[in-house]
């Protein structure tokens, strides 16, 4: 293990990091591990949803993420991963919500540019905005210099191999796990239905050279199990 992602779902998860970024970053660095990316918070939904039509929610989203981006930049973290929306959203409101996402991420991109960090938008499942190739490519096309974080257990509409090919070189981060195509499950690769050979080859075609970041329920697993799993993925690619 050489690279990890610092992650938190809720704003409260980042209190210590905001207070003293070094206290979080240095213990990893002192053990030869680089925190390469930070996963920006997405909860509470009603407070920081970038797809919201409420201007106050949009402002809170940007204010919250600015503080975390600034802290991340101060310790040399390179990438900020962001969820494009909360949920649920109906089919009828998706165009309006997508427009809000593009507006807010455009503003967030200015903030990450200010601090020298790359911004990567993550594909999401179910009714979230960014759930399929069409919405993800629309977001990326609208914001110059925005990148993608591809989650291998989120697509419930499009084939993952085709998804990777569609996002191509815009992918600079991964969240790796397996699932049953019914809902996200965060299982170890080969414990679900993903076509791992196809995904690995599509990532090669895209020129992906970033971190292979597992986002798996540990369930008491050892570090050796992840090492063995990654070796199997490489062997079968």
Role assignments for model-derived ranges:
Residues 1-74, 113, 147, 159, ...:
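N-terminal pre-domain/capping segments
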Residues 4-6, 35-40, 80-82, 119-121, ...:
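Hydrophobic faces of well-ordered beta-strands that scaffold small-molecule active sites
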Residues 7-11, 40-43, 85-87, 124-126, ...:
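Active-site beta-loop-alpha junctions enriched in small/polar residues
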Residues 15-18, 49-51, 55-56, 91-97, ...:
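Short, solvent-exposed loop/turn segments at secondary-structure boundaries
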Residues 16, 20, 60-64, 100-104, ...:
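Soluble or luminal CAZymes and related metallo-dependent hydrolases
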Residues 20-31, 101-111, 163-166, 198-202:
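Catalytic-core regions built around general acid/base machinery
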Residues 30, 47-147, 157:
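Active-site acidic/histidine proton-transfer and metal-coordination neighborhood
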Residues 106, 130-149, 155-237:
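Histidine-acidic metal/acid-base catalytic patches
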